[in-house]
Swiss-Prot record:
This is Tryptophanase. Belongs to the beta-eliminating lyase family. Homotetramer. The modification N6-(pyridoxal phosphate)lysine is found at K270. It is an enzyme of class 4 (lyase). Its cofactor is pyridoxal 5'-phosphate.
Length: 471
């Protein structure tokens, strides 16, 4: 099949979920009732749901079959050992704690690493700073509620939608080391490497950059946590783009990548393809004390450490999903689907971030230049897209980034993006064509789209539950 321009989806669809069509007037009323926040829409009112790829896609028949092997023992479950063995085989990590999802892992490891730095290095909580190539929203939120200032150290081209680069998710290594020296290494309890870098547009991090980042971290004795939601997509980009890895398998690249971290926190609802599940894992005995502390917190916050909020069948399914998500043909199809959508949008004059993994990212700032950042152009675009076509998407910009917890001022955002997140094995090329057609209509009316202001604003992670109105 090497000579075909477009290959169909590499799977057969056996089970379907009917969706209903609605009228424009119905959708206008629905988004108004939802406070101009697509998160607050009912799913039955959504025709194409591009809010997230987290737990919203299809599962493989092997994953579904694995559910039947579930051992529901409260402690020492056979299914836990199946999962822990998969982690050791894929990532090379010795210690595994299952969690209900990624934020379950974050609420455990973040306070433990802060406490450890305080006890061993004399961390001053009033000066505490944590670094990342870009923090995912919940990782940022958990860091902030534990008193840390978050600092994203990304490359200058990361958010420039006019520039293409192979690894726009990379750390700016110079800024990272300068930042550590500025605040004092003792005041940096951890560094988070986010793969792929969601907020920059699903952009990958190169192995060379991971290796150099890890060398800096070890120089200052700072633990590195790999935020691993899209580990397989990142490995695919390394294989396709980074010199020297073309002949490596996805499994080999993944194993190599995790040499450059001390722990991993994962929402398994993305590349591991499960509807619910997460992981918190530690590399070796150098992190055994942290692992033991996290096990204790897991009992209080998630469940016994050998189930962590997951039933036995779910752990079996996750063990299979970790492997299924690394299939070469699957990843090629998935990334090509994103490229098809981005190329189609660019062809009608809708500027997008360079195609990355899991989503197309529309540059709302360029499509709606009349709306200032503090009136959330990408959120306004999301509402208009829903009105036009019943498509639910998510803002990745000033609305999501939020305010400085110390000053209360809006944090400056490097780009105002609308994320069109593609659930796995759920939508076909026909759906992509429909999305492109919807944007044609949105673009024709772009100058009439209004900015938004708050009617209700939560203090933390406001984008999930805030309510807004048109200015």
């Amino acid at each position: 099949m090497e000579n075909f321009k477009h290959l169909p989806e590499p799977f057969r669809i056996r089970v379907i979920e009917p969706v209903r069509r609605t009228t424009r007037s119905y959708r206008e009323e629905a988004i108004l009732k939802a406070g101009m926040n697509p998160f607050l829409l009912d799913s039955e009112d959504v025709f194409i749901d591009l809010l997230t790829d987290s737990g919203t896609g299809a599962v493989t028949q092997e994953m579904q079959a694995a559910m039947l092997r579930g051992d529901e023992a409260y402690s020492g479950s056979r299914s836990y050992h199946a999962l822990a063995n998969a982690v050791k085989e894929i990532f090379g990590y010795e210690y595994t704690i299952p969690t209900h999802q990624g934020r379950g892992a974050e609420q455990i490891y973040i306070p433990v690493l802060i406490k450890k730095r305080e006890q061993e290095k004399g961390l001053d909580r009033s000066k505490m700073v944590v670094f990342s190539n870009y923090f995912f929203d919940t990782t940022q939120g958990h860091s902030q509620i534990n008193g840390a200032t978050v600092r994203n150290v990304y490359t200058k081209e990361a958010f420039d939608t006019s520039v293409n680069a192979d690894f726009k998710g990379d750390f700016d290594l110079e800024k990272l080391e300068q930042g550590i020296q500025e605040v004092g290494a003792e005041n940096v309890p951890y560094i988070v490497c986010t793969i792929t870098c969601n907020s920059a547009g699903g952009q990958p991090v190169s192995l060379a950059n991971m290796r150099a980042m890890y060398e800096i971290a070890k120089k200052y004795d700072i633990p590195v946590v790999m935020d691993s939601a899209r580990f397989a997509e990142n490995a695919y980009f390394i294989q396709q783009r980074e010199p020297g890895y073309k002949e490596w398998t996805i499994e080999q690249i993944t194993y190599e990548s995790y040499k450059y971290a001390d722990a991993l926190a994962m929402s398994a609802k993305k590349d591991a393809m499960v509807p619910m599940g997460g992981l918190l894992c530690f590399k070796d005995k150098s992190m055994e004390d942290v692992y033991n502390e996290c096990r204790t917190l897991c009992v209080v916050q998630e469940g016994f450490p050998t189930y962590g909020g997951l039933e036995g069948g779910a752990m079996e399914r996750l063990a299979v999903g970790l492997r299924d998500g690394m299939r070469q043909d699957w990843l090629a199809y998935r990334i090509n689907q994103i490229e098809y959508l981005v190329n189609g949008l660019e062809a009608i004059g809708v500027v997008c971030q360079q195609p990355g993994g899991h989503a197309a990212f529309v540059d709302a700032g360029k499509l709606l230049p009349h709306i200032p950042a503090d009136q959330f152009p990408a959120q306004a675009l999301a509402c208009e897209l829903y009105k036009v076509a019943g498509i639910r998407a998510v803002e990745i910009g000033s609305f999501l980034l939020g305010r400085d917890p110390k000053t209360g001022k809006q944090l400056p955002c490097p780009a105002e993006l609308l994320r069109l997140t593609i659930p796995r094995a759920t939508y076909t090329q026909t759906h992509m064509d429909f999305i492109i057609e919807a944007f044609k209509q949105v673009k024709e009316n772009a100058e009439n789209i209004k900015g938004l202001t708050f009617t209700y604003e939560p203090k933390v992670l406001r984008h999930f539950t805030a309510r807004l109105k048109e200015v």
